[in-house]
Amino acid sequence: MLKRFFKESLIYGLSTYIQKFIGVFLLPLYTALLTPEDYGILDLLGTVAIISIYLVVSGTDSSLSYYFFRKEHTEERPVMVSSTLIIRLTFASAAFIIVGLLSHKLTFLIFGKDYSLFLILTGISLAVQSIYSFFTDLIRFEKRPWVFTFVSVSNLLVNIGLNIYFILILKKGVWGAIMASVISYGLMAGFTIFYVFKRYGFHFSASWAKKILVYGSPLIGTAFAVWILTTTDRYFLAHYRNIADIGIYAVGFKLASFLGLVSGALQMAWSPYAMDIQYESNAKKIYAKVFFIYFVVNILAVFIISMFSIDILKVFTQPAYYSAKAVVPFLCMSVVFFSGYFIVSIGIAITKKAQHTIWITLTAAAVNIVMNFLLTPTIGAVGAALSIMTANFLIFMLTLSVSQKLYPVDYGYFKIAALFLPAAVIVTVSYYFDLKLTIKIILGVVYFISAGTYLYLNLKNSDEMKMILKKIKSMGSKNKAAEAAFVPDDLPENPA
């Protein structure tokens, strides 16, 4: 079972890797042709799209995930899936109309200027993205990762081609970036509708619609709190600093989002996998292993990105964006804590106690607002990054605490801390003394050797490590046998 999970994670990771690669590919394009202010406008428009998508989804993704894997509802999947898509289509249409009607007032409120056309296009983009996200969720539930990868890659290739055309060739700037998203996701939304109704039929059940909405409705408050949690920093920066600072901050976030290669892949495979194995006798043991592997891999990834952030920025951006280096470590850890929350919330999901996510997220959002109010006016983007990292750490810890009470799992906290603390010290020293690249490479090699040794000593008696060592020994034996097979029997004797 665990092998299947990591196989699916690897496939999802391939798709995520390509997404991140394309993100890297577009970053030089954006930073070369868009000013930090333009990039800031795009980022703020993105925050409007995020809350709109959350409201459109309205927890229906979690609802479908829950009912899709209930054994007693297997035969009802067609009407369940079709009804959920119809709900999504209805909410997406309503969201677009509302954003369109309020576009003029909203843009003046956010930017102090009339960017209503940009916001209307963003409204179209959010509508089609929310429909496309239904497809990606469904494909994961169906455990068809290769289909997910194919469709995702197709979408991304179209997106990157349109970005190059609109921004590089036509010089359309912000408008071009949004239009590329509208067209690429619009095509995928059309495919989603065709796929679902072709595969599951066109059905609508009021009773299933009610079940889906009742299960997901508590998550609307959570979604709103998550939006506050993840976007407050931009609005504080816009108020106390300027739009250009948001652009620089957004580039730092883009760098931190490379962690999505690991976090996103595990997260996409995790929800259907975790719910599917809940009835297995060794489910808790598997949950603990996934938790440990998730944090080990992410700590190592955060170490690399944080240590070499300025070097990465010099390769992929322009000098105007180099100051994003200061926020990268905090934003990286923020991503790790936020994605880790999905891993440790398994107890809440299994026991159907989703209401806990509301107060947990609201608490974290409140802390984020207070910290932004205190820190952003004085230390700018660094204060915003510290605020979101602290808030996501809080949401992770509170979720872990509640989930453990509902469904205890024996996680190995000390082993994680032993890896994290040395990494944090090395990165801090590197930033404080602004170390040269060669010294950072040496420190990185030393840390990885130490971490590898530590992991080996702690895991050498585990079943997985024994299996790996057994395979290595087996390969060695086969190689020796192969070598012996090629030694002739009639070799001449040694003349000596």
What are these regions (language model features)?
Residues 5, 67, 76, 128-151, ...:
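Membrane-interface junctions at transmembrane-helix termini in multi-pass inner-membrane proteins
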Residues 56-73, 141, 252, 256-291, ...:
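Helix-loop junctions and terminal segments of transmembrane helices
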Residues 64, 136-137, 141, 145, ...:
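C-terminal transmembrane helix end/exit motif
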Residues 120, 149-197, 214, 362-367, ...:
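Hydrophobic alpha-helical transmembrane segments
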Residues 431-496:
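Membrane-proximal transmembrane or re-entrant/amphipathic helices at the cytosolic face
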